[in-house]
């Protein structure tokens, strides 16, 4: 096991900066997930750690060793890719044993390691099969098993579930999380899927345009996003954003959301007269027919554009009289349809405020 640190790490391809001044400490035994849209720098960061790309500036350490100049084979890591890269002419056993054979390990030690990993992953009965005889989920387990037998200090996983269907992905998420718990080894995982990130990571590093936006626990990312990007990226459906304006009413500073007057929070008042964006998560917008007991309600009149029945909830797409569109997640018992005029209710205790120009959160 080992900790990992990125210290002012930059990776530049000609004029394109893929990773920009990344500073990140990953604890020994932690499950850290890099998440972000395509091209954000998450996979490049993993490849820099693996030694598949060279660092332009800064340094990467595994434990107390600087690894910038070390080849991948000398970094004591194991990597699982999106494409499982199994040798088609080899059996499962031979695929899992291959790296140990190259290292010249004794046959009995290889057998013990392979059988132990196979038992851990529930693939003991597949050891004699070839990859073409396996399902996608089974191939994924073999690829993970091949990494386990090496007993690395750090596991690196680059979108390993992308090739699985939805049901298998749920199962594989649970298996990888359990594997991390059983092995107590550092896992660094890359995905564009926020569900994978939220359900698997001890902490999540959110990236955009090569820059680390926020690294925190799943709960803190969701409840205390550092900026507009994180707020909009984490959560499905995404957070709604409204432009709010300042006004004076009866000698007091207020805010206006499409004509609906709101009190001015102290934190916002301290921010001066800078332009504001208000964030409201879809689950904090309610139909008046079904309201939770403890909220500070505010009416938000709107016209319904579309309703999606999800079974346990309704996803409602609506639009205010001023033309601002938003999404609400409401009780499925509500009888609501397209073109209905509804006075939705929002919980003002669950508002998020952002500096519109700086895009940073105001707490």
Curated annotation (Swiss-Prot):
Disruption phenotype: Insertion mutant loses its GG uptake ability, and shows leakage of glucosylglycerol from the cells into the medium. Mutation does not affect salt tolerance.
Gene Ontology cellular-component terms listed: ATP-binding cassette (ABC) transporter complex, substrate-binding subunit-containing
Positions with a binding annotation for ATP: 36-43
Induction entry: Transcription increases in cells adapted to higher salt concentrations, whereas transcription is weak in basal medium.
InterPro entries per record: AAA+_ATPase, ABC_transporter-like_ATP-bd, ABC_transporter-like_CS, ABC_transpr_MalK-like, ABC_transpr_MalK/UgpC-like, Mo/tungstate-bd_C_term_dom, NA-bd_OB-fold, OB_MalK-like
Superkingdom of source: Bacteria
Domain ABC transporter: 4-234
Localisation per UniProt entry: Cell membrane
PROSITE patterns tied to this protein: ABC_TRANSPORTER_1, ABC_TRANSPORTER_2
Membrane-topology descriptor: Peripheral membrane protein
UniProt KW Repressor keyword: no
A Gene Ontology molecular function term of the record: ATP binding
Subunit description: The complex is composed of two ATP-binding proteins (GgtA), two transmembrane proteins (GgtC and GgtD) and a solute-binding protein (GgtB).
Described purpose of this protein according to its UniProt entry: Part of the ABC transporter complex GgtABCD involved in the uptake of the osmoprotective compounds glucosylglycerol (GG), sucrose and trehalose. Responsible for energy coupling to the transport system.
Protein name according to UniProt: Osmoprotective compounds uptake ATP-binding protein GgtA
Native species: Synechocystis sp. (strain ATCC 27184 / PCC 6803 / Kazusa)
Taxonomic path: Bacteria, Bacillati, Cyanobacteriota, Cyanophyceae, Synechococcales
């Amino acid at each position: 096991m080992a900790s990992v640190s990125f210290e002012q790490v930059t990776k530049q391809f000609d004029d394109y900066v893929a990773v920009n001044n990344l500073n990140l400490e990953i604890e020994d035994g932690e499950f850290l997930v890099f998440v972000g849209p395509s091209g954000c720098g998450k996979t490049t960061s993993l490849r820099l750690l693996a030694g598949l790309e060279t660092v332009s500036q800064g340094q990467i350490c595994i434990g107390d060793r600087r690894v910038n100049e070390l080849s991948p084979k000398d970094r004591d890591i194991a990597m699982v890719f999106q494409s499982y890269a199994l040798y088609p002419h080899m059996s499962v056993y031979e695929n899992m044993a291959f790296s140990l054979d190259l290292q010249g390990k004794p046959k009995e030690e290889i057998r013990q390691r392979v059988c132990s990993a196979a038992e851990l992953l529930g693939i003991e009965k597949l050891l004699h099969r070839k990859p073409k005889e396996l399902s996608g989920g089974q191939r994924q387990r073999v690829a993970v098993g091949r990494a386990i037998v090496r007993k690395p200090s750090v596991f690196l996983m680059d979108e390993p579930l992308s090739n699985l269907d939805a049901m298998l992905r749920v199962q594989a998420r649970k298996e990888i999380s359990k594997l991390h718990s059983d092995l107590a080894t550092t896992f660094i995982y890359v995905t564009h899927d926020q569900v994978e990130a939220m359900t698997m990571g001890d902490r999540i590093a959110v990236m955009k345009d090569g820059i680390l936006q926020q690294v925190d626990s799943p709960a803190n990312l969701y409840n205390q996003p550092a900026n507009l990007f994180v707020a909009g990226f984490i959560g499905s459906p995404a957070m709604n954003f409204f432009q709010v304006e300042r006004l004076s009413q009866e000698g007091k500073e207020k805010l206006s959301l499409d004509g609906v007057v709101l009190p001015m929070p102290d934190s916002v008042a301290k921010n001066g007269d800078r332009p504001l964006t208000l964030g409201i998560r879809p689950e904090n917008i309610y139909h008046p027919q079904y309201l939770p007991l403890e909220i500070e309600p505010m009416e938000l009149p709107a016209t319904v554009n579309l309703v999606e029945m999800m079974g346990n909830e309704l996803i409602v797409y609506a639009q205010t009289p001023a033309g601002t569109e938003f999404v609400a997640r409401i009780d499925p018992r509500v009888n609501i349809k397209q073109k209905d005029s509804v006075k939705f209710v929002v919980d003002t205790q669950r508002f998020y405020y952002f500096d519109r120009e700086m895009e940073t959160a105001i707490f």
